[in-house]
């Protein structure tokens, strides 16, 4: 069976959907325990106080409070959640 394969443009035209990564809650925002703060591939952001990290490197709040981004050692950006009373100071 003689078949001629389709030309280029007919065989292209596929693209994967975006993964919806990035910062979900910004500095100063009020969050509750369990809220996702950042979805990421690898450790662009590191967990600080009041924050946990899932196996896919998702950073989430473990306490209620306000989000704070800050730089640490080795030029790492840490995300912390400060309890409301502490954040007001």
Swiss-Prot record:
A GO biological-process term: translation
Domain of life: Bacteria
MF annotations from Gene Ontology: structural constituent of ribosome
GO cellular component, one term: ribosome
Keywords noted in UniProt: Ribonucleoprotein, Ribosomal protein
Annotated region described as Disordered, given as residue ranges: 1-20
InterPro entries reported for this sequence: Ribosomal_bL27, Ribosomal_bL27_CS
Transmembrane regions listed in the UniProt entry: none
Disulfide bridges in this chain: none
Family, as annotated: Belongs to the bacterial ribosomal protein bL27 family.
HAMAP family referenced in this protein's UniProt entry, alphabetically: Ribosomal_bL27
Name recorded for this polypeptide: Large ribosomal subunit protein bL27
Source organism of this protein record: Ruegeria pomeroyi (strain ATCC 700808 / DSM 15171 / DSS-3)
């Amino acid at each position: 069976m003689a078949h001629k394969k389709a030309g280029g443009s007919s065989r292209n035209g596929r693209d994967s959907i975006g993964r919806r990564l990035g910062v979900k809650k910004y500095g100063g925002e009020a969050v509750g325990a369990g809220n996702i703060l950042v979805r990421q591939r690898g450790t662009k952001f590191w967990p600080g106080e009041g924050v946990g990290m899932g196996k896919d490197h998702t950073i989430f709040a473990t306490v209620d409070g306000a989000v704070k981004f800050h730089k640490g050692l080795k030029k790492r950006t840490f995300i912390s959640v400060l309890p409301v009373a502490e954040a007001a100071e």
